[in-house]
């Protein structure tokens, strides 16, 4: 008879992983190359990544955390001299759901990105100039295949978990579709099997905004200055879609920056100021061409129609999470994932969490996610350790 | 509901007794997952829950259970035929509008269905109605008329008749009054009942059903 060991609650005693550093690994060096879904190939490919915690001697406690559109490898802890922690610091660290006292957590920047991994702003070794639009189109499957090389080099046969929100969730799903035998569990959060026309439309407006900026110059702006206005507008659109009507009301209402209207087109409302601020900040840290490539990769992504779970026996456990006020990735899209899992009799847990934060909830709505992820991982970990995997 | 000395609800104990070791079990409306957890731990069952309440789902996941958030009426549609050995529908039958549809669906995805419900014809309920002239309130029907989630008010005899009419075979039936098993005159003396159902030979009433057609064409 089994008895349930009551796990320690993550709340209360959680700490930061402290000072961390981004590392780099180069794969697909000539004569090798990374074969891409489009038929093209690319190499060498550099991947920026960070790790937190220690890998077990039997390498069974590795968790791959996957970032969203504008994220990077810096998921937790602090960079030297930096004020802000990594993008998922609330969830990764000692005593946190991704407990680095127990698990080895890896996060890598996607290919096509601009945060240290090879992307359109990287130097093309054949021309010694930035790739710009010479950069081949990459898909979510390509991002995942690059990550698989990283995991291979680390000597990890099977990941305890792949987890991420939004585009990170797409990558988690793609991991199961591409390499089901290499993932023990998956946590796709606020994500979808495919973009709806509405989601594609928002991305297309963002892309058009970048490409309509004369400073874009067909992508050849490196060394001159990137299309900041276009990229800023693209990001503003993004931020509108990340919030809910209610969260915007709570955050800004119709409050003014100054006491009265200026009767010109300056930012009068706080919400305008916020969007401007977000846009202006974003152009300092993100490459416009990367934005084009990555949004396209998200639009191309499609694991609907039974492609998530192929005919191989899949014993990956799933924890699927959506948020009530998320209208960019509505709950019905997560429910569609769950439907696929039920049809293929894959072990699944699904919960739609109450939140008013919209799509942003996956980064800020912590309570429910903390409880669910902590216990889900604990069960997965125990199952793996006891060698009594889930029979099908 | 009372809890007996070994920490398990008497209705859960009866359901537990009906389940074969190592079975695949789906609990519709599994609440905080006590029954599933007990089955997993002590019958080596492969269990899955469906539950609507977010807080209850947290409790299930805390116990290491897999649960999908869904209402009972739409939670079964995606499961292929014969996904489970048992589908449990305990203490929620009386809250369901499409009773026959759910039971048929449950017998599509599972080989057997275990149904537990409160008995509306329990003697104290009859007395409340007959002598008091008031809508009955009993330990198994604890709600006022104005806040009850129940939409179906059935007795054990009603359900037995329903099973005969719809082609369900009653493999087992157990009756409870508090912690006590009732064998004599259950429709009068029992507060609740647990039925183990399967299709009567040659019935499988769902084959002509438009819902399962929809499901099958999707596969």
Predicted regions and their residues:
Chain B
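A short SAM/SAH-binding and catalytic strip from SAM-dependent methyltransferases
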Residues: 86-97
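Short conserved loop adjoining the S-adenosyl-L-methionine
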Residues: 75-81
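Conserved alpha-helix/loop element of class I SAM-dependent methyltransferases that forms part
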Residues: 6-22
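Glycine-rich SAM-binding Motif I of class I
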Residues: 33-37
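S-adenosyl-L-methionine-dependent methyltransferase catalytic module, highlighting the catalytic core
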Residues: 100-108, 112-211, 215
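Class I SAM-dependent methyltransferase "Motif I" SAM/SAH-binding loop
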Residues: 29-31
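Class I SAM-dependent methyltransferase SAM/SAH-binding core
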Residues: 38-75
């Amino acid at each position: 008879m089994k008895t349930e060991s009551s796990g320690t609650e993550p709340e209360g005693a959680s700490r930061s992983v402290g000072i961390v550093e981004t590392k780099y690994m180069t794969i697909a060096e000539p004569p090798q190359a990374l074969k891409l879904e489009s038929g093209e190939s690319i190499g060498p490919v550099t991947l920026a990544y960070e790790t937190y915690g220690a890998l077990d001697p039997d390498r069974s406690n590795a968790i791959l955390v996957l970032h969203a559109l504008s994220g990077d490898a810096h998921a937790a802890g602090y960079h030297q001299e930096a004020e802000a922690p990594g993008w998922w610091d609330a969830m990764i660290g000692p005593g946190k759901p991704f407990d680095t006292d127990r698990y080895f957590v890896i996060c890598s920047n996607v290919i096509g990105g601009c945060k240290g991994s090879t992307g359109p702003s990287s130097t093309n070794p054949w021309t010694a100039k930035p790739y710009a639009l010479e950069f081949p189109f990459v898909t979510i499957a390509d991002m995942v295949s690059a990550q698989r090389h990283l995991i291979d080099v680390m000597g990890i046969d099977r990941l305890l978990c792949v987890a991420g929100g939004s585009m990170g969730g797409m990558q988690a799903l793609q991991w199961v579709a591409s390499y089901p035998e290499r993932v023990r569990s998956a946590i796709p959060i606020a994500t979808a099997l495919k973009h709806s026309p509405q989601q594609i439309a928002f991305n297309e407006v963002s892309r058009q905004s970048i490409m309509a900026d004369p400073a874009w110059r067909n992508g050849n702006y490196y060394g001159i200055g990137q299309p900041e206005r276009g990229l800023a507008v693209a990001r503003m659109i993004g931020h509108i879609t990340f919030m809910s009507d209610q969260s915007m009301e709570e955050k800004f209402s119709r409050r003014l920056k100054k006491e009265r209207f200026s009767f010109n087109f300056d930012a009068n409302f706080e919400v305008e100021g916020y969007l401007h601020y977000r846009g202006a900040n974003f152009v300092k840290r993100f490459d416009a061409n990367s934005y084009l490539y990555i949004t396209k990769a998200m639009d191309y992504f499609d694991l609907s129609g039974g492609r998530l779970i192929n005919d191989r026996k899949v014993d990956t456990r799933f924890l699927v999470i959506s948020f009530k006020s998320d209208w960019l990735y509505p709950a019905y899209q997560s429910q569609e994932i769950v439907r696929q899992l039920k049809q293929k009799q894959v072990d699944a847990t699904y919960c739609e969490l109450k939140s008013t934060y919209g799509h942003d909830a996956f980064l800020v709505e912590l309570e429910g996610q903390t409880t669910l992820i902590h216990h889900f991982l604990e069960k997965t970990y125990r199952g793996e350790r006891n060698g009594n995997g889930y029979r099908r | 509901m009372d809890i007996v000395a070994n920490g398990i609800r008497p209705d859960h104990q009866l359901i537990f007794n009906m389940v074969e070791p190592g079975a695949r079990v789906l609990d519709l409306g599994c609440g905080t997952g006590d029954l599933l957890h007990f089955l997993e731990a002590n019958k080596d069952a492969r269990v899955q829950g469906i539950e609507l309440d977010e807080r209850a789902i947290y409790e299930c996941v805390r116990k290491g259970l897999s649960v999908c958030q869904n209402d009972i009426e739409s939670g079964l549609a995606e499961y292929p035929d014969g996904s489970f050995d048992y589908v449990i529908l305990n203490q929620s039958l009386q809250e369901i509008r499409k009773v026959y549809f759910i039971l048929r669906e449950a017998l599509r995805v599972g080989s057997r269905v275990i149904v537990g419900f409160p008995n509306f014809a329990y003697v104290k309920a009859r007395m409340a109605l007959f002598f008091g002239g008031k809508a009955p309130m009993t330990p198994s029907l604890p709600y006022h008329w104005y806040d009850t989630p129940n939409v179906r008010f059935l007795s054990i005899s009603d359900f037995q008749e329903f099973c005969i009419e719809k082609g369900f075979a009653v493999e087992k039936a157990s009756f409870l009054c508090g912690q006590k098993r009732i064998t004599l005159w259950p429709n009068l003396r029992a507060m609740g009942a647990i039925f183990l159902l399967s299709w009567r030979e040659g019935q499988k009433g769902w084959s002509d059903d438009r819902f399962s057609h929809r499901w099958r064409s999707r596969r």
